[in-house]
Amino acid sequence: MANQFHEANRRRWDAASASWAHHADTRGIWKRCHLDASLALDAAELNWLRDVGGKSIAVLGSGDNQVAFALSGMGAKVTSIDISEQQLDVARRRAAALGLNVKFVQADVVDLSSLGNATFDLVYTGGYVAPWVSDLTRYYGEAARILKPDGLLIVSEYHPFRRVWSRSASDLKVGINYFDRGPHRFEAAMDVLYHAPGELEQFEFHWTVADYITAILASGCQLIHAEEFGDTSEEWEGAPMSGLPVSLLLIGRREE
């Protein structure tokens, strides 16, 4: 049975794919990140991705596919997985234009049954994927299942501390309880970056730091590294968050 929250989010991303593609075209990172991986991956992430040439890597919730393109440019054999077929269609066209050999698979990250057990040397997921997913344990459980023994699960997510603030250009004030995991229902506009109301239904989930750690451990991976990085603030975030960590990086190793 299809997950109603994920189906709503799939429809939302299918509908918004053209708008999101326009933003990506304006920034132009997708055109260059296969030549310079640091455009798509932070130094903290690249520390764990130094020697990926020839390795099989799955990117879960690949979205704009900048990470997938960066890893492909580094010589990895990349499989890009996303719930939105429209997002993947955009990525296919871009990969062809860049001459990149990336495999694209449409799937929900909590059901990767189209992918075999112990298939990949490394699984990367992050950016802003987990807030769209209703079951973190199944999500990371599937990620671990497709990992080869001793393979790495790299989770690099938007930091949960940044999700609690009210929208204000000048003040930091808690607007959402840190422990209110949701589902949070929104009627959103076509433009993903801006918070105007619209006709597209979407659901988000606010996972805590402990939720991320617990889900990785439950997946059968050993947690071998944890790190927070970034301290800037972006206009789309709607609050002055400079000085707070931007991202949470967790590294798991699939146990034998």
Predicted region positions:
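A short acidic, Gly/Pro-enriched loop at the edge of an enzyme's catalytic core
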Residues: 110-123
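Conserved class I S-adenosyl-L-methionine
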Residues: 152-189
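Short alpha-helix
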Residues: 203-226
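A short glycine-rich, Lys/Arg-flanked "PGG" loop and its adjoining helix->strand segment in the class I
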Residues: 137-152
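Class I SAM-dependent methyltransferase SAM/SAH-binding core
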Residues: 56-111
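Conserved alpha-helix/loop element of class I SAM-dependent methyltransferases that forms part
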Residues: 25-55
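A short SAM/SAH-binding and catalytic strip from SAM-dependent methyltransferases
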Residues: 121-137
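N-terminal, positively charged/glycine-rich alpha-helical extensions of SAM-dependent methyltransferases
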Residues: 1-28
